Amino acid sequence: MSGPSHVPVLLDRVVALLAPPLEREGSVLVDATLGLGGHTEAVLTRFDLARVVGIDRDPEALALAGRRLAPFGDRFTGVHAVYDELPDVLARLGLDAVDAVLFDLGVSSMQLDVRERGFAYAEDAPLDMRMDGSTGPTAADVLNTYAAADLARILREYGEERFARKIAAAVVRERAKEPFTRSGRLVELLYAEIPAPARRTGGHPAKRTFQALRMEVNDELAVLRRAIPAAIDAIGVGGRVVVESYHSLEDRLVKQAFVAASRLDVPEDLPFVPAGHEPALRLVTRGAEKAGPEEIALNPRAASVRLRAIERTSKGAAA
C-alpha cells in the first residue's frame, strides 16, 4: 500500500457482505490479514457497535495499522500472529466465537513498496520476501539450497511458470558460481532463460517466479489450508467468512473448503432433507465474484481478485 489513502480491492462489496453480522451489538470481526488496516477502518467507521481483532504476521504492517486505527480506541485490537493461529488468538482474547472473519490474501502494496523486503522485481534488493522478517528462510535460502526438481515444482505449481525446469536448472548452475543474494541478479537470469516471444506476453517475466518464491517462503497455501476451516469453526450463527484471493490455487482451496462445509449430509437421491441433516453453512456468493472494469482501471491488482463468502446458519459442525 502506498499509504493510508490506499483503498482495498472491492472494499464496498466486502463491507456489504460483512454488514449483516456486524450490525449486531457487540459484534466482532477478525481481520485476519490486517495490512495497513483499510478494511478495518471501513468497518469501524461504518458499524459503530463492532469491534475488530486485526491479525498480521508483519510487525511493520501491524505498527502502521495500529497508528492509523488509534482513533478507534479499544474497538481495535492488533495481534502479531499468522492467520492459521486464529484459534489460539481467540482463546487468548477469551472469545468463544466471532461474527465474521475476513481474509485479503497475498502480498500487500506496502510490502511491495519497501524495497528492502525483496518482494518487488522492479528494483534491485535483498532476496528476502518474508512477511515476518524476523523468522524463517528467505527467498535467497530457497534459491541457494533447494534441489532443481523442487525449484521447478515450486515455480510450476505456485507461479504457473511454463519454463520452470529451464529456470530451475539455470538457478542451480549459477548459484554454483556465486550464491544468489539480490533480486536484480535473479531478474537478469529470468530475462536470459525465458524466450523473447514469451517475455512479450503475460506481464513482467519475473512476476511468476517472484510470486512462487513468496508463496514458498511464507508457506502460504499450507497456512491458508489450515486457516479457512479454523475461521469457519470460529463464527457463530449468522456469522460470515469472506475471502479475497488473487491466485488460482488459493481460490480453488477456498472454494473446496466452502463447498465441503455447505454440503448436504444426505444421499443425493433422497427426495427430502431429514431434520437434523441440514447443512450448518450456506454459500453467500454465487461462485467467485470479480471486480468490474472501472475498479480494474483504477487498481490493476483488482483484475485477479476472486471474492467468496460463506455464512453459518446453524450450530452444527462444518463438514
From Swiss-Prot:
EC number of the protein: 2.1.1.199
Gene3D superfamilies in the record: Putative methyltransferase TM0872, insert domain (1.10.150.170), Vaccinia Virus protein VP39 (3.40.50.150)
Name of the protein in question: Ribosomal RNA small subunit methyltransferase H
Gene: rsmH
Record organism: Nocardioides sp. (strain ATCC BAA-499 / JS614)
GO molecular function, one term: rRNA (cytosine-N4-)-methyltransferase activity
Listed InterPro entries: RsmH, SAM-dep_MeTrfase_MraW_recog, SAM-dependent_MTases_sf
Enzyme class, spelled out: transferase
Protein family (similarity comment): Belongs to the methyltransferase superfamily. RsmH family.
Residue sites binding S-adenosyl-L-methionine per the record: G37, G38, H39, D56, L90, D104, Q111
Pfam families, sorted: Methyltransf_5
